[in-house]
Amino acid sequence: DVTPSAIFIDRRGNKYVGSRAYNNAARSPDNAAVLFKRLMRTSTPVKLSAVNLTMTPEECSAEVLRTLFGYLPEDVRGDGDTGTVITVPAAFNQMQKDATMAAADAAGLGRVALMQEPVAAVMSVMRQRKNDGIFLVYDIGGGTLDVAIAESIGGRVNLLAHGGIAMCGGRDFDRILFDNVVKPWLLDNFDLPEDLAANPQFKSLLRMATWATEKAKIELSQKEEAVVSLPETELGVRDQSGE
């Protein structure tokens, strides 16, 4: 299973990490932290204003790493020989790598090694084939984009070249789909201002609409058509007829 990098804290102080947190973030964005990987080793705080909490990107990452590590059996976690490999984008600089290591330390992971994501991808492929080769790895995640050329020789993988964009990923595709497909439909059918993104009143609406857009985008990976489904009862807006 995939564990999204998301944190959600409800008004009672209960903390959720992963899929439940990500899904709840659409309905209550001020209770959630998402996309903090982009902010690693920056001075940008992550604010959960609904619960009056401010976290650093490293603290957010530590919460996710702690949750993932907790999936292991207790005897494995407590074994001194147990180590953890964390994959990071090829475009991560040394400061971002140091921040990732700091998050791992805060999460109590113990022995940790970092591996560039293209290298990990090639190693995964090589487990299923015997021949060495040169690979072009195109890695687009939720927040980052990397393109790399890697070579496998005798089971060892070397990264020959790489390039990337720290602020380009699936979430940016969501934004483009929203701006060009969903937003025009919302403006045509509901009583909304043109600059709704600048109005805090519509923050939850925007998050719900973006969440629905993402779901449709994922469907398009396997289908030629997808429906963006927006539950009107949760949008909290009136249509053009006033209903």
Name these PLM-found stretches:
Residues V46-L48, L72-V76:
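Transmembrane alpha-helix boundary signature
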Residues T42-S43:
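A glycine- and small-residue-enriched flexible loop/hinge segment at structural boundaries
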